[in-house]
Amino acid sequence: MFNIDEVYTISSFLSVCNKTIENNIPTCWLQGEISNLTRPASGHWYFSLKDNTVQVRCALFRFNQRYIKFSPKNGIEVLVRVVPTLYEARGNFQLVIQQIEQIGIGNLNLAFKQLKKDLDNEGLFDNIHKKPLPNTINTIGVISSSTGAVIQDIIKVLNNRYPFVKILLFDSIVQGQDSIKKLTNALNIADQSGKCDVIIIARGGGSLEDLWAFNEEILARAIFNAKTPIISAIGHETDTTIADLVSDIRAPTPSFAAMLVTSNRLELLSNTNKLYTQLHQSYRQTLHYYQSRLNQLKLKISNPNKQIDYLNQKLDYLSINLTTRKESIFTLNNAKLNSLFTTLKQHSPIKTIKHAKSLNQMSLNQLKYQIKQIINTNNNMLYLATERLQKIIMALTNKHKARLSIQANSLHYLSPLNILARGFSITSDTKNQVLSSVTNIKINQTIITQLDNGALYSNIEKIEKN
C-alpha cells in the first residue's frame, strides 16, 4: 500500500506499483495483432499487441513457449492469456504472456472443450465403460494410413516382440476434410468383421488442425459403441484428443500401443520352459510314488503258485506212498482200500487245483482292477495338473504384462530425454559444468543451452539477479 507521508526512491516506488498491479489485476484473455516482434539470443520473445487505437508491450518467456504449435509473426491475430506487470528496471508496463493461440486455433479449442464437456456429462469417458484387453491376442486390427510411418513402426515392434500375431490394416486417411468419414467407416468395418481381438487407431503427431478428425463426435461415438477393445495412439504424448479420452486404453505413441498388446516372445518361451520342467518333475515324482505303492500292494497279495506247488508236492508224496503200500493194503484190507479211495476222492487234488486256479483268477482280476483304478487316478491327477499349469501360465502372462506396462511407464516418465522434450533445458559452460546460478557467470562468457533436439551457444551480454 502507498504511504502518502513517505518519500519513495524510484526503485521502491516502482516496486510498490508493481505489487499493486499484480495484486489487483487478475490474469485475463486479450485479443490483438502482433507487431514489433523480436527474438533475442536468450530465447525470450518480445512484441507489441495492438488494436486499431493502442498497443502494449508483451513478453513471452522461453519456458512458456513449449506448447506453442505455430510460429508467431508480425500482423497475425492472436488470443493471449496475460499477467499484467511492471518491468521495474525501466519502469515499463508490460504483459507477461502465459498462453498464446491463433484466433482460428482458439475457436477449435473452444469447440474441443465444449464437446469434451458434453461427452463427459454423458459418461462416455467413465472407466466403467472401458473394455479390458483379452488375455490372448492373435489378431490385431490397425486403423491408419498405409503410406505413413506409423504402420511401419507398429509392424516392426510386433515382429520383434511377437511375430506370431496377425495384423489386419484397415487403410484410412488420417487428416483432411474426408478423414473423419474414412476413419469412422474403417473402425466400423474392423469392429463388425469379428476378426480382431483388439483394434489400434493411430497416427503421428501434428498440429491441432491436423489432428482434428480425432476430435469429432461421430468418431468418438463409434469408438464408444465398438464391441472390440480400442487402443488410441494419436500424435505425441502431449496431444490429447477426444478419441483418446473415449478409447478403452490410451497409448502415448503407436509403438507403445504395439507393446501393450503383445508379450515378449523370449520371456514367454523362458516361462514356458520353466513350467514344463516343473510339470515334468512333478509327473516323475507322482509316477514314482504310485509305482512304489503298486509294488507294496503286490507284496500284500498272496501268490497262488506257491499253493499249487505245495499241493503238487503233496500229491507226489501221496502217490509214492500209495505205490509202495498198495499191495499190502490191497491184500490186508480191501475195505480199507475202498475207504482210502473214498477219502482220496473226497480230497481230490484236481478239485483242489481247480479251486486254487479259481482263487488265482480272482486275485488276478482284483489286481487288474486295482491297476486300472491307479491308472485312472493318475490320469485324473495329470489332467488336473495340466489344467492348473494352464492357469498358472495365464496368470504369469498377465502378471508380466502388467509389470512390463508399469516399468515402461516409469521408464518413460523418468527419462531425461522426456524432460527435455517437454521444453526444459540444461545450461552449462564450455567445460560442461552445469550452471545453476548467475553468480558463476561473467559478461561475454559463452554458455551452452542443451535442448531436446540440439544445443544453443550464447554469449552473455547482461546479467540480472533475482
UniProtKB/Swiss-Prot annotation:
It catalyses: Exonucleolytic cleavage in either 5'- to 3'- or 3'- to 5'-direction to yield nucleoside 5'-phosphates. It is found in: Cytoplasm. The gene is xseA. PANTHER family: EXODEOXYRIBONUCLEASE 7 LARGE SUBUNIT. This is Exodeoxyribonuclease 7 large subunit. Bidirectionally degrades single-stranded DNA into large acid-insoluble oligonucleotides, which are then degraded further into small acid-soluble oligonucleotides. Its main location: cytoplasm. Heterooligomer composed of large and small subunits. GO terms for cellular component: cytoplasm; exodeoxyribonuclease VII complex.
